[in-house]
Design a protein with these regions (language model features):
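Short loop/turn elements at secondary-structure junctions
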Residues: 2-6, 11-12, 90-151
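Alpha-helix boundary/N-cap detector
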Residues: 39-42, 46, 79, 83, ...
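Ordered, amphipathic secondary-structure segments that act as subunit-interaction surfaces
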Residues: 61, 77-101
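Functionally constrained cores in energy, signaling, and assembly domains
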Residues: 54, 83-85, 122-124
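Conserved short "hinge" loops at termini or chain/domain junctions
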Residues: 1-77, 135-151
């Protein structure tokens, strides 16, 4: 999420989001979101912010999350966007179980978290921009290890 202040925003803070409330329609009907949040868009925005931050936390050690979440429209990574939507819907349905099947969303959320844990551990490698240093060279954490010892 990026924040801008200026005349175009009427001197107020204007949020430009990685994911908009309208884009959640692909995962949850608008009338259900409306019922869960009682029409309060701030609840939806907070759920999106929390989801972005949760997904970002798994990607941050290795990937350039500022670039990933600054992307707009078709420039966004489809899998990161999909996972962010699922985490957002999970954040919303925790408030209420209106016309949703809790177990299905719990299973989807758990699957996303398992995938993100794999990304964080380095066993899953999405096509995302890697972190770079001041010279523009990719920063790679050095990891050492060995095979289990035989006794």
């Amino acid at each position: 999420m990026r924040w801008t202040v200026g005349p175009a925003a009427g001197g107020k803070i204007n949020r430009t989001m990685y994911l908009t409330p309208e884009e959640l329609k692909s995962h949850m009907y608008a009338h259900i979101v409306e019922e869960i949040t009682e029409g309060d868009e701030q609840i939806v925005l907070q759920a999106i912010e929390a989801a972005v931050e949760e997904v970002r936390s798994y990607l941050r050690p290795r990937y350039d999350t500022d670039r990933i979440f600054a992307a707009e429209g078709s420039e966004r990574n489809a899998l990161v966007l999909e996972n962010t939507k699922i985490v957002t819907v999970w954040n919303l349905i925790k408030l209420s179980n209106v016309e949703t099947i809790y177990e299905i969303w719990k299973e989807r959320y758990d699957r996303v978290i398992k995938y993100l844990e794999g990304v964080a551990a380095g066993t899953r490698t999405p096509s995302l921009p890697l972190l770079t240093d001041e010279k523009g060279e990719v920063r790679i954490k050095m990891r050492c290890g060995s095979n289990p010892k035989f006794r």
